[in-house]
Amino acid sequence: AFYGVSLFEIINYIEHYGLLRQKDVNGKYERVLPEHSWNNNNIVTNLFLYQLQRHSDHHAFPTRPFQALRHFDEAPELPNGYASMLLPALIPAWWSKIMDQRVFDHYKGDLSKANIHPKKRKKIFEKFGLAFNRD
């Protein structure tokens, strides 16, 4: 059970790292869209994992059967499949080296839209040469 829960949580971390649904003027989160989770369109891996790496389609359309999950160009793309991302996800410096630039690129440099741990926010803004605002 420990192994299963741990694997589930690591994959969940990989699928959503740095991504954040924005709030509207009423404080409600925007509808879940394909750009709110990371995908990987590797055909072989998707066959073995029942299209799990087309995670964005699953979130945007939760009732769609796994066989029909689609690729979305607007969904952010992981550099490798889940199996290749497991070990880096457990080593923060390695993971940061792989993923932080991708989060930055996904939000077109506007890290105020990214999901960043409050204690690491200033460091990440400085890493990309951005002015840090505590607001």
Cite the ranges covered by each PLM segment.
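Cytosolic/stromal cytosol-facing helical appendages immediately following the last transmembrane segment
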Residues: 3-135
